[in-house]
Amino acid sequence: MGKGNKKRFAQVKNRHRLLVLIWVLQLVAEALACYGIWELNMLPEKYFIILGAAMAVLAFLTALLLLPVRTGRLQAGMGVFLSVIIFGLSCAASWMVLDARGTIDSVVGQVSSKASAGVYVRAEDRAHDLQDAADYRFGLINGYEMQRFGEAVAAMEETLGTTMSVSYYDGSQALLNAFFGGEVDALIVNSAYVDIFEELDGYEDFRSRVRLIHEEKLNSWSSVLEGMNANKPQKGASITTDPFVIYLSGSDTRNQTLATSRSDVNILVVVNPETKQILLLNTPRDYYIPNPVSSAGTKDKLTHCGIYGIECSMEALAKLYDVEVDYYAQINFTGFETLIDAIGGITVYSEKAFVTNDKYQIVAGENTLNGAQALSFARERKHLSGGDNDRGKNQMKVIQAVIDKMTSGTTLLTNYSDIMASLEGMFATSMPMTEISALMKMQLADMAQWNIESFAVTGYNGSDYTYSAPGTKLYVMYPNDEDVAKAQAMIDTIWADGVITDETVPAN
């Protein structure tokens, strides 16, 4: 063989090796994408088979173009072009699957509530940490949280290496009066109570008058609620055939993480997957109902129940409507705003024109809103004649608009990365991954349309003592028993595989 022939043969051999390498890389990328999609477990089996078959056909086609030893330039070029495209798409699919898995792992199955005992001093105080306040007189609220706070105080005493001087007061008002009157130098309170303090006359500016110098973790109330639920039978139902209830909570946390706090959005999502029926049932935040952590059944605002953990709010609503609440989904206000921006805004209908507290103009009719505007629309109550009742209805309009937007067209695909980023750290659910996967598979398999109806119970304005702020009367809303009974009847209808429509939803 001449030198020229040897050189050409070597070139052909090297080119063939390169083409084989390109094909192998494509094959590996396809295999990894298929494995990731299979492991995510959200694609129905028939679609996964179709996807696998399509990838196999593409691999075979590129093999015909790339693997023959003697391949023409045009054929090789077409093969390389096609292989690179498939490789890129497979890598993108793998990245999306990994991103989805990371986000899902961060939000699924969370059942614990984070709470802390905050040590507060007056804004002008010299202390900047717990050590600076070692010799201070500390004030606590007497009563219901004594066990949890006793453990927190013991932990702080261990840190300080000394016994703390602690005085106890009957109720929030008495504690704050003593603190700002100079009887004690610092407060030890549940950090979530700051919002409650600002409901009290004379302390609306509480945040600006104090500084937080230390936080001590509080044990969860979950053990108390688990004890209450110990004798309940296990549901043992199929998520794709039997009705279930999700508690949707809008956390009153304004920062970038979820924490134990009041809940301004309290909606039960009653679902019958067999009849494709969903009921959004709103309960006003100030509804005056028994607080589950009170052994005596002392009444409280519904929003205050969130201070003791999301499980407490779930149990309070379960008792109100005499229904088992199976799961929760919690989103904080920051997450609510970023999610709406991630899907490109929403459109909601308002019966009335008004200006929100954040100075956004809402017109009578359709309104296209970004995240900040939608959040302001959902929060507003002071400029609405129906107050909390109207706010609850608007919150459900926003939720409905988000569902409509996310299930329409290519919203999920084109805004995928932003949606995933908006959920991480802002959203939590107790629904297991296996059940989320089952629901996703069911929906993708039948692509059914869901009938979504909404109902908001109403009530009567009043003033009364609450479990979370004993000794002080706060604004509350006494339940409208007729509305509660209507809501229970609608839940029973859905449970019995019945259907509710716009015509059958009771007026209120």
Kindly give the residue locations of the regions a language model identified.
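Short, Lys/Arg-rich, polar N-terminal cytosolic tail immediately upstream
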Residues: M1-F9
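N-terminal Sec-pathway targeting helices
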Residues: K13-I22, L66-L82
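Membrane-embedded alpha-helical segments of integral membrane proteins
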Residues: R17-L65
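Short hydrophobic alpha-helical membrane-anchoring segments
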Residues: L32-E39, L65-L67, L89-D99, E198
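Short N-terminal helix-initiation segments at or just after the protein's N-terminus
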Residues: L58-V69, G79-V84, V194, N266-N272, ...
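Internal/C-terminal transmembrane anchor helices
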Residues: L74-V97
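Alpha-helical transmembrane signal-anchor/signal-peptide segments
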Residues: L98-A115
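Non-catalytic, solvent-exposed segments at the cell envelope interface
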Residues: V108, S112, Y120-A123, D129-Q131, ...
